[in-house]
């Protein structure tokens, strides 16, 4: 709703219009305070142009804009709609940022941005006329560049969001995908884009319907705008049609139902090797309908392959469940043995003394002598006999980030020659993503007693929702069990390149994994092969400190290191240049404390992974005294030094003139 009449142009410089008597707009007494606070979205007058090149228009627009914004704050409006009609809006960004930082209000500001620029919708009138090359981006991408430039000027303020205006023509799917990674709060649907069905009711085309379904997943609000083009029907028929689409959209999957409320919620990765998990955490994992059925099938297949039919009554397979928790894998093993009509002897090994109480209760009440409960670290336990089969569920969202390779290699001495490990192999995957929501969430994790940028030095487990994946995931690290040399150096390094098809901004990397339990039985959280209905793992997010623009046919690169004292990094090489960083992974690798967060895999502090990030073309050196990020021009002068000091980890930076943009 316009706060002031859209044709009421106020004058703030010249008399007599400047001193015009009477109220400028309607009284706030027309509605109750609650209605103003919950039902009304303010709208800036269309004649206001704070970035006009005419000084008189610009000054008058500045004063009028501040007047309307201040009156909207006085009313307590929940949101205010402002148009974004061009690529250069520095004065608009300055005025809005000043209003946000100096005012005592919580109003959201929705920037009205069209999917396609109006000038790109007109038809060519002259045949064979040369097509002009736009200066501010290609046709499909022009308005996104407007938005990106504006939100960058406003320093990614989380109170500035997008109201996306949908026109009759839609851009390519790649462009729409990129918009869905932006903080869209509303979608504006002009009445002119609605068609008429056989009964005279307004409807949308199939392409527009698919877009509406995708926007509904982001829980955006819809604004119907324009003249009534279906006079035979009431205007509310537009809203009734949108309600019909909302009720008939595809039902959510089991994974989406479980993740409801966790969308884009940052959680610290679990470290079960270091911390003892809580009972509620075990309970959440045990509710997964897919994971343990797959484990049961893998154990069943393994038992059939290892024991001949004529020996099934005499051959007793020794199964060691490493990290038994509260016993779900033990129960899966028992069910598999009954299904295969095989005899098994089970050792349930668990280091958490609290979970051991539950295991002993299971043994006393259900399992009996067939199961032996062992309260010990699997790496330190001296087994009374060697196992035919090792079963574990030590994987994290990035496969090895919960130190599964170190644990299983440390317990391999319990496995006899020719024995089997379930899982037998697992691979981590990495994909570049763009997400203003996640970038702002990470920035908001800052704490006063920590380094001001410590929140960017750790990964987060998160249910990715409001994001745009810039390229398909690529494999990073692969581990096999059992390994011929369990004491090998586990350091690995991978350098990846991603082809990015649209102009975009890199905010970080999403990590996934795939694992082969046995034979062709797999579990996966990689989007292309995700196990249907499985929700034990959310993806992992590696943020970067400074967002990097790029894409539009350029190549993105990522370098990642895994192992004790290894170095790695990630980046995007495009129009924004190259980015370099370092990552340390391993049981002894340093870490920075992370913000506490709840959730299934988010109650522990991240201690296995540290990322140090720096400017373009930086070089990382890792030594006994920590990690240094060096400038190639002056390698003797570190840009950033991270070192352990008396049990803590301190990040030092030189004076600003030496930091080259850090």
What are these regions (language model features)?
Residues 1-291, 297, 304-318, 322, ...:
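Class I SAM-binding transferase module
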Residues 326:
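Conserved SAM/SAH-binding loop
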């Amino acid at each position: 709703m316009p706060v002031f009449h859209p044709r009421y142009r106020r004058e703030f410089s010249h008399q007599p219009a400047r001193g015009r008597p009477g109220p400028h707009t309607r009284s706030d007494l027309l509605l109750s305070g609650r209605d103003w606070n919950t039902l009304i979205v303010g709208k800036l007058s269309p004649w206001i142009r704070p970035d006009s090149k005419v000084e008189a228009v610009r000054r008058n627009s500045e004063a009028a804009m501040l007047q309307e914004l201040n009156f909207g704050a006085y009313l307590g409006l929940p949101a205010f709609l402002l148009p974004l009609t061009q690529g250069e809006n520095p004065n608009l960004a300055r005025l809005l940022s000043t209003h946000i930082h100096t005012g005592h209000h919580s109003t959201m500001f929705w920037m009205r941005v069209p999917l396609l620029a109006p000038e790109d919708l007109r038809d060519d009138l002259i045949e064979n006329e040369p097509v002009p090359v736009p200066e501010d981006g290609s046709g499909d991408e022009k308005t996104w560049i407007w938005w990106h430039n504006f939100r960058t000027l406003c320093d990614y303020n989380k109170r500035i969001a997008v109201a996306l205006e949908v026109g009759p023509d839609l851009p390519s799917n790649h462009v729409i995908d990129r918009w869905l990674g932006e903080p869209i709060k509303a979608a504006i649907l002009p009445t002119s884009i609605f068609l008429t069905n056989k009964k005279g009711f307004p409807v949308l085309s199939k392409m527009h319907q698919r877009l509406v379904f995708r926007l509904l997943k982001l829980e955006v609000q819809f604004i119907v705008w324009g003249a009534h083009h279906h006079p035979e029907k009431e205007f509310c028929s537009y809203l009734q049609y949108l309600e019909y689409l909302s009720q008939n959209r595809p039902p959510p999957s089991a994974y989406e139902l479980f993740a409801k409320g966790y969308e884009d919620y940052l959680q610290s990765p679990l470290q079960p090797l270091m911390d003892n998990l809580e009972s509620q955490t075990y309970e959440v994992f045990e509710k997964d309908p897919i994971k343990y059925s797959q484990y049961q099938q893998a154990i069943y297949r393994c038992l059939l392959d290892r024991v001949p039919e004529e020996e099934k009554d005499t051959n007793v397979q020794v199964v060691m469940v490493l990290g038994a928790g509260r016993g779900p894998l033990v129960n899966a093993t028992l069910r598999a043995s009954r299904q295969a009509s095989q005899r098994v002897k089970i050792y349930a090994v668990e280091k958490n003394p609290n979970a051991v109480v539950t295991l002993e209760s299971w043994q006393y009440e259900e399992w009996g002598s067939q199961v032996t409960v062992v309260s010990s670290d699997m790496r330190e336990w001296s087994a009374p006999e060697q196992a035919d089969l090792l079963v574990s569920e030590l994987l994290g969202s990035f496969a090895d980030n919960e130190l599964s390779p170190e644990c299983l290699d440390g317990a391999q001495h319990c496995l006899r020659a020719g024995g089997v490990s379930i899982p037998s192999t697992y691979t981590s995957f990495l994909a570049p993503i763009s997400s203003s929501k996640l970038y702002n969430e990470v920035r908001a994790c800052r704490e006063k007693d920590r380094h001001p940028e410590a929140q960017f030095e750790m990964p987060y487990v998160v249910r990715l929702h409001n994001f745009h994946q810039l390229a398909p995931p690529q494999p990073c690290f692969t581990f096999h069990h059992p390994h011929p040399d369990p004491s090998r150096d586990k350091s690995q390094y991978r350098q990846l390149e991603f082809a990015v098809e649209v102009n975009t901004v890199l905010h970080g990397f999403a990590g996934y994994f795939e694992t082969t339990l046995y034979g062709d039985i797999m579990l996966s959280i990689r989007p292309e092969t995700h196990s249907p209905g499985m929700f034990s793992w959310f993806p992992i997010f590696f943020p970067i400190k400074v967002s990097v623009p790029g894409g539009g046919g350029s190549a993105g690169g990522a370098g990642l290191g895994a192992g004790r004292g290894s170095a790695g990094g990630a980046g995007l090489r495009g129009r924004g240049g190259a980015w370099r960083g370092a990552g340390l992974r391993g049981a002894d690798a340093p870490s920075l404390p992370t913000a506490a967060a709840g959730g299934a895999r988010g109650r522990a502090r991240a201690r296995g992974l540290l990322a140090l990030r720096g400017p373009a073309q930086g070089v990382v050196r890792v030594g006994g005294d920590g990690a240094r990020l060096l400038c190639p021009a002056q390698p003797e002068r570190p840009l950033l030094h991270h070192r352990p000091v008396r049990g803590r980890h301190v990040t030092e930076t030189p004076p600003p003139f030496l930091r080259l943009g850090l």
